[in-house]
Amino acid sequence: MSLTYYYAPQSTASVTTLVLEELGIPCERVKLDIRKGETKKPEFLKINPNGCVPTIVDEGVAIWESVAITMYLGEKFGEKAKLWPAAGPKRGEAMKWLVWTHVTLGEAVYRWARNTMWAPEDQRNANAAATATKDIGKLLRLLDDALRERPFLTGEYTLADAHVNSFVDWLRHMKIDMDGLELLGAWSKRCSERPAYARAMERENG
């Protein structure tokens, strides 16, 4: 078994857990306890000097950052499984949504979280939080509109849908307002009804 997956349940690794379930590929799973500092131990820092999950090691090469992992697994395993577009514009579209989620939407979410729950109360900026909330709403409407004429982000379900929906799930858990985003809600429901999603949730909660 050449693929090793380092993860922690209920963390930023959740999306990779879902991607692996969708692909159904065998791997060695190494569970790390973030609260106990296991991601900061020297033996793990040799694999990922950032000290964070998710991280995979395939054929002796360490790959970190969830977007990079999804793209890599998609290219290596996903095309054959019909979960990743062949090289061409559709693959570019899938990659676009992955990067948009973590860069454009992610930046607004970071500003919101920084000023609502991550920073000490005396270091939070209510105006910045309000602006971030508006920006998140605008971006989610953009995503909703992109689903107006197609059931999934590139037309057919791919790992991009799994990945982006995992992020949307987290926003919903954080009580981000999604009222009125009916297309987004229906898309998320379709993604969440897949068997791989149920298996991933079992791993997350097990």
For the regions a language model picked out, list residue spans one by one.
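GST-like fold's C-terminal all-alpha helical module
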Residues: 98-193
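Short, flexible loop/turn segments with low-complexity composition
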Residues: 86, 156, 199-206
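Active-site-flanking alpha-helical
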Residues: 74, 167-168, 201
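Conserved beta-strand edge residues that scaffold enzyme active sites
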Residues: 34-35, 185, 205
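A local structural micro-motif
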Residues: 28-30, 155, 179, 199
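Phosphate-coordinating loops and pocket residues in cytosolic domains that bind phosphorylated ligands
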Residues: 46, 193, 202
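GST-like domain detector, emphasizing the conserved glutathione-binding G-site
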Residues: 1-127, 144
